[in-house]
């Protein structure tokens, strides 16, 4: 099968049904598993559901939704916290549908300049100006919104230096109580720098510390009978409390991992939050296999050892790990981790302040991830049972496999084999096979070779699927039939999955081996949804492998490595186009204009140098 535009259908109804109303960040993935969009929400369910309304006005949203193959979320305590995490994810994943696909130097920042009377301002680009930078922010409007808030809270100038130098009397900002007018010496340097220091602490996330300092200053001003100054501090405190959102993401921890644990219905979720440089840099859910009735502390001890100390893990141990329960009454585990890091490592469960909020946040995400996984498992079990009934299986279906072929113009052919059981994808059993020694573009031969690679040496009956899906029509299915006719063992049930004319989900034709009769299923049948899921996963896995192989070839690709381009044609191409770089940049029409180069060969040359 040539790489096409087959797109996995995202089950938005099922996802939204169990989505929380809490604030957080959502990530959208395409069929290749790449993050294509990151967003934040005050109400996750309300925001995410807006993408799947029947009428969506924005063309960008329509295009984006068509590309969604899966989604996941990270719950946060506040919308402000979600904003910071959203920015972290955008930097990490660089999603193509987010606006900010650029380097850090192009992200906007707030700058507090190094000046006798520092100013707060908007900055983008190289950091040549001296001062303190705060950010980056996800977009310019976020910076301007923050500057507007800061101007209301701290009377610090935001004017250009040239405007500042030209003043002979206070401007309107002074009248609005948004600047102390240091330009004309209305305030002292100490008074101005006092506000600068408070603004800096606020930008560092030390909100409560700012309020505490203002309270002390207000009380001191009252004691000194400076009631006007005391009133100014009082108003400042009121404004801060009104706008304050305690954000646990910007605490004082420099390097901290926080772990949450949730268990239920035979499943365990361990949730990791990674805090670096005072920010939540990311999160991840793990679902370890845990024997029944294993105590929580034992589960966590085993997880910590495997997560941080495995020879193959390669993870950096943080200086502090916050846990939901105590795991080391004898401190042995902390000593082992400290030895590995060559610095003291704290493992603690009794925490306060920001760490307690991190701990609570990790627990929220653990519960959310567990509920989501249990829902997926329930859906998978229901669909598997439906398929079992359709195929009239007398015993439960234990294992299903699906094959797909991916290539571009017959080059870098890759076959995929994905495996599903009653709980969903079994990714540890996934396999890819590089297909060589066939006529380029011969999908039938590619399928035959892939089956031989997978099953020729399959000696353990437990690894043989109950059902084998073949992504393709009767021709591809016939290759599987021919192979298993001579196999000498009990063959799996073979089913061909042929695409409809428009390749739209729901229009597939399911073909049984032997009789080649079609299996009638409605568009909303659970069994069909399962088959689509398996087929789409096989397609995704094949395309991903093919692209990786093609990209690898591209790095070393030369005309000598392209089938059909011999010495004479190579010489003609270089003579007419001028050099290898010109060949790489040439269009198909330009390549086909070279004497001796056919249209089909021009296409082969063109695609050999491209990833898309």
From Swiss-Prot:
For whether the record's keyword set contains DNA repair, the answer is yes
Q: What is its main location?
A: cytoplasm
A single GO molecular function term of this UniProt record: DNA binding
Tell me the ranges covered by the UVR domain, including all copies: 208-243
Subunit annotation: Interacts with UvrB in an incision complex.
Functionally, this protein is described as follows: The UvrABC repair system catalyzes the recognition and processing of DNA lesions. UvrC both incises the 5' and 3' sides of the lesion. The N-terminal half is responsible for the 3' incision and the C-terminal half is responsible for the 5' incision.
What is the recorded name of this protein?
A: UvrABC system protein C
Organism annotation? Idiomarina loihiensis (strain ATCC BAA-735 / DSM 15497 / L2-TR)
Q: Which gene encodes it?
A: uvrC
């Amino acid at each position: 099968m040539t790489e096409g535009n087959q797109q996995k259908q995202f089950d938005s109804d099922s996802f939204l049904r169990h989505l929380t109303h809490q604030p957080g960040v959502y990530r959208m993935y395409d069929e290749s598993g790449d993050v294509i969009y990151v967003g934040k929400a005050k109400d996750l369910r309300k925001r995410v559901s807006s993408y799947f309304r029947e009428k969506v006005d924005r063309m960008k949203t329509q295009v984006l939704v068509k590309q969604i193959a899966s989604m996941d979320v990270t719950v946060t305590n506040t919308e402000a916290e979600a904003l910071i995490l959203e920015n972290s994810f955008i930097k990490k994943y660089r999603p193509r549908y987010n606006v900010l696909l650029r380097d850090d130097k192009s992200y906007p920042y707030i700058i507090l300049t190094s000046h006798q009377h520092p100013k707060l301002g908007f900055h983008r680009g190289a950091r040549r100006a001296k001062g303190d930078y705060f950010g980056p922010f996800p977009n310019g409007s976020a910076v301007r919104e923050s500057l507007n808030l800061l101007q209301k809270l701290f009377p610090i100038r935001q004017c250009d230096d040239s405007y500042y130098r030209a003043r002979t009397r206070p401007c309107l900002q002074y009248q609005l109580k948004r600047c102390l007018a240091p330009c004309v010496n209305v305030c002292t340097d100490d008074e101005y720098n006092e506000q600068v220091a408070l603004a800096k602490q606020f930008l560092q996330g030390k909100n409560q510390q700012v309020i505490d300092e203002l309270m002390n200053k207000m009380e001191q001003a009252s004691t000194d009978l400076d009631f006007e100054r005391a009133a100014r501090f009082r108003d400042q405190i009121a404004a801060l409390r009104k706008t304050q959102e305690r954000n646990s993401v910007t605490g004082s921890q420099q390097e901290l991992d926080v772990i949450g644990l949730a268990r239920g219905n035979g499943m365990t979720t361990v949730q990791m939050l990674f805090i670096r440089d005072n920010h939540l840099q990311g999160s991840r859910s793990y679902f370890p296999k845990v024997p029944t009735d294993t105590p929580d502390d034992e589960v966590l001890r085993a997880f910590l050892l495997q997560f941080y100390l495995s020879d193959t893990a390669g993870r950096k141990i943080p200086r502090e790990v916050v846990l939901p329960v105590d795991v080391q009454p004898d401190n042995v585990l902390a000593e082992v981790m400290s030895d590995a890091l060559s610095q003291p490592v704290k493992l603690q469960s009794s925490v306060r302040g920001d760490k307690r909020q991190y701990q609570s946040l990790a627990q929220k995400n653990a519960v959310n991830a567990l509920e989501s996984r249990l829902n997926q498992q329930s859906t998978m079990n229901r669909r598997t049972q439906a398929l079992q009934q359709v195929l009239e299986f007398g015993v439960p279906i234990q294992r299903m496999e699906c094959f797909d072929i991916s290539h571009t113009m017959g080059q870098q052919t890759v076959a995929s084999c994905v495996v599903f059981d009653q709980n969903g994808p079994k990714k540890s059993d996934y396999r890819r096979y590089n297909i060589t020694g066939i006529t380029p573009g011969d999908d039938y031969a590619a399928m035959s070779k892939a089956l031989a690679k997978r099953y020729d040496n399959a000696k353990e009956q437990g690894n043989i699927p109950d059902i084998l899906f073949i992504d393709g029509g009767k021709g591809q299915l016939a290759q599987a039939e021919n192979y298993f006719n001579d196999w000498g063992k009990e063959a799996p049930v073979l089913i061909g999955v042929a695409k409809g004319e428009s390749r739209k989900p729901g229009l597939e034709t399911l073909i049984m081996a032997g009789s080649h009769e079609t299996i009638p299923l409605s568009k909303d049948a659970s069994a069909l949804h399962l088959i689509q899921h398996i087929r789409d996963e096989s397609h995704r896995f094949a395309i991903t492998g093919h692209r990786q192989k093609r990209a690898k070839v591209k790095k070393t690709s030369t005309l000598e490595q392209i089938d059909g381009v011999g010495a004479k044609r190579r010489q003609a191409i270089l003579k007419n186009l001028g050099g290898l770089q010109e060949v790489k940049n040439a269009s198909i029409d330009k390549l086909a204009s070279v004497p001796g180069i056919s249209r089909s060969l021009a296409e082969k040359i063109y695609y050999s140098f491209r990833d898309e």
